[in-house]
């Protein structure tokens, strides 16, 4: 059975300082970084020993690709025949040479543009470098009021073949977006409404806990990042007996890496083959 794993280790540092993010300009101690690297190496070793097909998305609390151990893990995992996809969420601030050693048939990047931290021109140059190398990727932004024009400018500057997604600004008051703004944003990302006003989740079918799992640095397995109940451990194999169909226990799920795994919503079809990296099937 194919498993999709969302890995989030101990890393909690970022080189950017976005004012809405709790991890802005935070720093990990050398000891914390060493432990994170050790944990990640253990996870890669586990994946190397598997025979079942796997897909992996790294969802760090911060920026992973500025750390060599994440770049090396991406390269190593991309070489495994059992890996369908390895992807990571990134601000795309690092150089590209590490990609030379990767198998680009299996690697993808989920890229976020932060206008307060980097110029549009610089970010677009990095996107062009990805296209030149043939790296599969998506591009997106947080849809803050201050960035409405920038969102449209970025979309206009990107080729139609580059998918662009949007996350609703959070936290926000109920009337944060006008109907006209929602229409503008939905023209950029037709799925924006699911992030803005997700349908109720409690009791809804979900692939998490069955074929999609969350893994932390200790190897503790949970069904997703938003349900804290452990299902066992990755490394002793105890999680395997807990894999089964489950409905969502939460009243609301407003994050793509959660609700995209609901089969009653359009994402499994619309993003077939690209759910983890947020690339639609038509891209």
Segments (PLM) and residue ranges:
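Flexible mid-to-C-terminal extensions adjoining Fe-S/redox cofactors in radical SAM and related proteins
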Residues: 1, 11, 24, 28, ...
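N-terminal pre-triad scaffold of radical SAM enzymes
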Residues: 1-24, 55-59, 211-219
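Core AdoMet radical
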Residues: 5, 25-37, 52-67, 77-96, ...
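Short, cysteine/histidine-rich loop/knuckle motifs that typically chelate Zn2+
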Residues: 20, 208, 250
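Short, surface-exposed loop/strand segments
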Residues: 20-23, 34-45
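Radical SAM enzyme [4Fe-4S]-AdoMet core and its adjacent flexible, acidic
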Residues: 30-31, 107-222, 226, 232
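Generic structural signal for well-ordered alpha-helices
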Residues: 41-44, 71-75, 99, 123-128, ...
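Short Fe-S-cluster ligation motifs
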Residues: 42-61, 65, 255, 283
